[in-house]
Amino acid sequence: MIFTLILVASLFSELHWRPIGPFRGGRTKAAAGVPTSPGVFYVGAVNGGVWRTVDYGRTWTPIFDDQPTGSIGAIAVALSNPDVIYVGSGEGLQRPDLSTGDGVYRSVDGGRSWKHLGLREGQQIPQIAVDPKDPNRLFVAVLGHPYGPNEERGIFRSIDGGETFQRVLYKDADTGGADVVIDPANPRVVYAALWEARQAPWENGEFSGPGSGLYKSADGGTTWKALTRGLPDFERDGLGRIGLGIAPSRSSRLFATVATKQGGFLYRSDDAGESWARICDDPRVVERADDFAEVKVDPVNPDIVYTASVVTWKSTDGGRSFTAFRGAPGGDDYHRIWIDPLRPATMLLASDQGAVVTVNGGATWSSWYNQPTAQMFHVNADNAFPYRVCGGQQESGAACVLSRGPEGAITVRDWQPTAVEEYGYAVPDPLDPDVIYGGRITRWDRRTRQVQDISPVPLRNAGYRVIRTQPIVFSPTDPRTLFFASNTVWKTRDGGRSWQQISHDLTRRMWEAPANVGKYRGTDPARPEQRGVVYALAPSPRDAAVLWAGTDDGLIHRTRDGGKTWQEVTPKQLVPWAKVSILEAGHFEAGTAYAAINTLRLDDLRPHILRTRNGGSAWQEIVRGLPGGGIVNVVREDPLRRGLLFCGTEQAVYVSFNDGDDWQPLRLNMPATSIRDLVVKGDDLVVATHGRGFWILDDIQPLREVTDALVGLDVHLFAPQTALRIRWNTNSDTPMPPDEPRGEDPPDGAIIDYLLKAGSEVTIEILDGGGKVVRRFSSGDRTEPVTDDGIVPRWWIRPARRPSSDAGLHRFVWDLHWPAPAALEGGYSIAAVPRDTPKEPRGPWALPGQYTVRLTAAGRSLTRPLTVRMDPRVKTPEAGLRQQFALSQRLAEALDRNTRLVEQVRRLRNDRPDDAALAALEGSAEERKPLVEEPQPALVPWNARLGALYSLLESTDLAPTPQAVRAAEKLLQQSAELSARAEKALATQKQMTPRVP
């Protein structure tokens, strides 16, 4: 596969991932504004990259998508030069569901380009502070590895714009920097918070230590002193994370959110940190203080204070009392507050739901339903048409999104929440797509919008353990059988009304702490004998009795008798708490399986995929070609091509053509983000990202077909997938505005993929079943640049398409229409799609049936069969469609004939503008009458009449009504007579035209 391996990354570069939503914001940790440019704000989603708005949050644009990471924890804009922006990667949190980063980035052109600066091993950067007077002087809080000790943590300083960093505050390899702020009145005064915390490898486990504390430097960060007077300490209070805020109008006043074992509290200092007092005892104000550590002070009034927590709170009395400023019953979970120093009523909030802006002090806010930064856990697709893509979204609940919108795009109308819990799976019933199973475990019915808990054990007990994500899988051999797992495996055949436990506890028998827990090993207060769960299930599509189960504590079991007995087949490569993230049962051999192993919780960022071909007796690691820092979350096998595998890492999708022996990137146009799950749905590859919602790669036939020999050919035509005749846009109303968020629909027609070894002129022809050429496209076709067309602005118009003649793989789309007839007036539907509205009239729809694609290039002519099928929702008999097509063809031909006659008349009239006979023959647009009235026997009025009736016939996939048929037959007869008279008159007129000697 060497040749293919070298070329495939560029070979498939024209394939295109399309985002489909949901457009509901996800966890956003970083936020900053630009005081000198009102309306400009930047936010960083924890796995969604960096976004900018220039219109106060009305729309958001990604500006970091070409970078190698999407996990963002901090953004800082230099006040003295707002073109200078610093980004810290890694979430900067301590929680069981996070993604790490790779250091600090800088832009010096307002986000148009980026440079990686360093601190790669820090993994998590929660805060960056830039000197308000010097854009090259900055401090970076580096939290460090969430699951292990490391040296690159603490507070770092740079005086050269990040070209070099110096660690200026450090405690030990277990303590990191949590916050850093610069005194706006005196930039040599810097405050910083250190935090000693470690995530446990099991769910919801966290350790802490005595390293946490608050520090101050008065000499620009060279030396530091601890600030302890009046603050909690670790031994007495269990001191944890600290968040800092300075009053810009009185910089001696500071506020601190402080986490302790008793809860979170707000402290205030009025002497520049020398002494502190707990100013507020309201537990709501600093709730979950290890998750939310944000306090900000109004830039003008030092008594107005805001804290970000489950709710955002506001105080007007210096922090003594608070009222809710923004929040919701479920908890929006706010992380960042930015207040415009020049306009304090303008604020930016970043939360688990996305980012919102206010310009009136919180009276109203922009929406977070315009940010495609959803953190999806898993993905499943139902069997409806078009199919829906479903999964749980972190913090917001589960959602299902149409894979194809009815209006030429996927809008807010095309997705809906599904009440099956935010975490984990949302699995449609294969026999009833309106029923969804999800969470831990519930059943939701779309028709009634009601949800029922169907847990095997409604009230948890010591023998029944579940965490936030539990596997839910239907049997691929019996669509009535549903599997669910806790620490054991369960099966139901009646939709969860009753359950059968089909396994014993499959997790580790004895509590074990891996080496990365380190010095905290003896501090776990619980120390239960068992704390793992079954995290992955994979029923075999080859053998109904075979089921694989993997645990989050590093075990794999297999049953070959439907769960009566289980055999442990754990690979020797697995260590305790190596999480079996996904298991995939082989589609071609019952003894084959693949396991994606996530070892982030072992402080191991390396990729791990295991393969067995003998039922688990032996396993082989298959990761060649995967990047060293690419933790693997999922691996899947294509059900049609043996050896074609896909995997998802923390940054991208990868593909293997040789059963995992070698991997290469399939990122294409997708931004770097955590790939949590993927499935093959028919000919499509559907992906759940944990920061950018769902994505679909349409028609993976080229991936199924590629071989070494194929890559070496001068030209190759791939087998087209079955094309569905679907109306691109069935909206009959005003379109959604272009600035409304939208996902992409599949290509509008038949996808034709071809490969050129070298540049060559290309011709693509579509032939019907009788060998007649339906359409012909050439790389030499003339295409005009898109401009305004009459009253239609250019941003609505679909550009003309022609086949590419460049070397490489190309994707061309035939829109399933015959050639368009010439018409005096073209137009665009009121139901337009931004940048994708075709001009009308188009040619008649091609009938469902068998066609041939013929590609001529590089001196060769290649053919492939193409099947066109009707939209499965349309039940019109074939005879009705044929009647419609025949009548439409005749009307199109008559319209074309009429139009060309008008053009001839107009050319003659250019030379003879006063010729009354020619003027009468042409007629005018003013003479057009409604269809119920007979127009004058002239070409232009009849052109409008033909065009109107043609459009009516082509507007639906139904047989024409009898009255439409009668009207068409009459019109066609009259048009033929008029055209014949016109042709005769033109011939006479041409004879009268004197010849030029």
Which stretches of residues belong to each language-model region?
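Mature extracytoplasmic or organellar-lumen-exposed domains after removal of signal/transit peptides
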Residues: 866, 897-997
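Contiguous beta-strand segments within globular domains
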Residues: 730-763, 767, 807-813, 895, ...
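Short acidic/polar inter-strand loop motif in beta-rich domains
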Residues: 820-824, 856-864
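Beta-strand-rich binding/interaction modules
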Residues: 442-444, 752-753, 759-776, 850-854
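Sec-dependent N-terminal signal peptides
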Residues: 2-9
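Glycine-centered tight-turn motifs at strand-turn-strand junctions
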Residues: 773-844
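Low-complexity, Pro/Ser/Thr- and charge-rich linker/hinge segments at domain boundaries
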Residues: 702-728, 865-897
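Beta-propeller blade termini and top-face loops
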Residues: 10-740, 747-750, 779-782, 790
